[in-house]
Amino acid sequence: MELKFNLKGAFKTSTDPTGAKEVIAQYFDEANNTILKKGAPEGQGAKITQWDIVDGSIELTIESGRYVRAHDAIMRLKKPLAAKLGKEFRIGIRGVDVKKFTISMPAEGEIGNMNIPHVSNISKVEGGLILELNVGESELERRIPDRILTLMEEKVRAKDYGGKAEHWQILWESDKKEHTFAGDPTQEMMKHGWIKRGASRGQWIHGPQSTKMFRTFEKIVYDELLEPLGYREMIFPKLVPWEVWQKSGHAKGVYPEIYYVCPPKTRDPAYWEEVSDHYKVTHEVPTELIKSKIGDPIGGLCYAQCPPFWMYLQGETIPTDEFPIKVFDKSGTSHRYESGGIHGIERVDEFHRVEIVWLGTKEQVIETARKLHERYMHIFNEILDLEWRKAWVTPWFMAQEGLTGLSEQGEAGTTDYEAPLPYRGDDGEWLEFQNVSINGNKYPSGFNVKSQTGEELWSGCSGVGLERWASAFFAQKGLDPENWPEEFRKRVGEVPKGIRFL
């Protein structure tokens, strides 16, 4: 099936246009051979297939393919027609009425149930889908039909990508190692009082021993990577409003995984008195009552750590000699709502991360990523002595832009670092414990960041998840310092004593 648009609409006029019928006919004939073909390959323009004057308005049907789309065609027709009718007949066009609008698009297999804004029905036919749109002139002007089509094409491509979220290609793998430990590190850390579950789901309280390990990991990253490569520390916000996620692109699909932030409707104590009184009497927090007193979500807690940083650069033009800009943030927690039941420290809702961000020309960004890979390899091989592998990962939304495959590995995409967890067995799933992403021009473009020379800017990011590092390291080495690599043991120093309980 080829992509087709079919729009039945009407120009609403200030008075009956019957007297102008001959002029309208001549204008539509000319338009079919001029403005409705402009910008399209031969034979690929839009076409008015029929029209008539009905109930004092000009009704018409427009059919088109991908190039001059029917909704663009009717808007192209409006202004010249209004000028012609106004000048010759003193008839005005008051607006466009969309009576029926369908898009036929190619798609194989089942897409599943969907509830798309401004789409009243989706029908499956041989070789494709038929979308019935519920739109008016305002939606045409805002290009809502184009956004609907883009969304549907993304969904089809995501499904055609094999039902997988990512494309995965191994790049490098360490030698297989003999592991001195085969237990679950989370259970072992709990058993020895290193960690305890927090009050919230997916949250942990880290005792002195675990905290010492996290600080050691951070120091290794700083000493071996951040300082030698010239990164500067910053503090990024941890409450992220919708505006940031709209510009970063996360607003397209972040909703199942974020913790939402809703402010009070007012800070007036009198407004909240009944909530306080309810708790004082019942010793129960009245969550339903609270829902009625808080505002709409303004955004969420930090999800991906780097987007808020970009507000610092938004709208700025940066001198050439400032590039590459290299910064990092380790100032607070990130939050993601994890599905399923109870997990260990390898999968948490609240986690600790060092976020590394860099910005420059395409060549500078790629070279910066290469140096990061070198330093990570040094850390994982020479200091932590891990068994691990490196894989090229292209999310499907990048794959649809042609960024998959070995030929693109030096450019946009993500490299994951994965480690086996011995307690999961020889065939167990490996843990992704580190990544390096080259994001192309996505963030500089989204936040309108420019170079002094006008050269296109790219960026990259790399998140050091301390829980993931701990999970990989302690799953392979255990908690006994005697089984740790000498270089790591030297950097830890003495493991602090935990807090004793009766």
Swiss-Prot record:
Q: Which parts of the sequence bind ATP? A: R336, Y337, E338, R347, V348, E432, R468
Q: Which InterPro entries match?
A: aa-tRNA-synth_II/BPL/LPL (IPR045864), Ser-tRNA-ligase_2_arc (IPR004503), SerS_tRNA-bd (IPR041293)
Q: Name one GO molecular function term.
A: serine-tRNA ligase activity
Instruction: Report the SUPFAM superfamilies cross-referenced here.
Output: Class II aaRS and biotin synthetases (SSF55681)
The source's domain of life comes to Archaea
Q: Name one Pfam family in it.
A: tRNA_bind_4
Q: Which GO terms describe its biological process?
A: selenocysteine biosynthetic process; seryl-tRNA aminoacylation
Residues annotated as binding L-serine: A304, R336, R353, V354, E355, Q400, N435
Keyword Zinc (UniProt): yes
Protein function: Catalyzes the attachment of serine to tRNA(Ser). Is also able to aminoacylate tRNA(Sec) with serine, to form the misacylated tRNA L-seryl-tRNA(Sec), which will be further converted into selenocysteinyl-tRNA(Sec).
Q: What is known of its domains?
A: Consists of two distinct domains, a catalytic core and a N-terminal extension that is presumably involved in tRNA binding.
Q: How does this chain assemble?
A: Homodimer.
Report the protein name in the record: Type-2 serine--tRNA ligase
